[in-house]
Amino acid sequence: MLNPNIEIKKWFYTNLASATALVVYDGFAPEGAGNEYIVLTGRTSTQDQGKEGYTNSISITVDIITKNANFGYKRAETISDLVLTAINSDTNITLANGFTASSLSVESVRNLDGLNPLDNVFRVLITYNIIITQI
């Protein structure tokens, strides 16, 4: 049994960077990351053993962060449209290491303000649910 979160993270990283041309970080962004970037966060998975392998229900959150006094949510929502166009229920996921993705769905899309309104941070969180199997 391999950790399915590793392969799904690699797949999302590649596809998000391609769809948005933004820097994608794993877990958190470093100090000075810039004004627009994406963070892959909130990865969870549960596993069921079947007759011929494992089935994993995976959840991953794509956190789109924009910092600018002039844009508000408009730029973050424009980026979220790029993400949702590239990665949606019709997307086929190809993974390595014997994993096969059978389902991809969007659980939620949420706007989130920064902790301090004076920071002018605007975020859109997209949570995906994926079912993958490993034989």
Question: What name fits each language-model region?
Answer:
Residues M1-P30, R43-I135:
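Charged, amphipathic alpha-helical segments and their flanking helix caps
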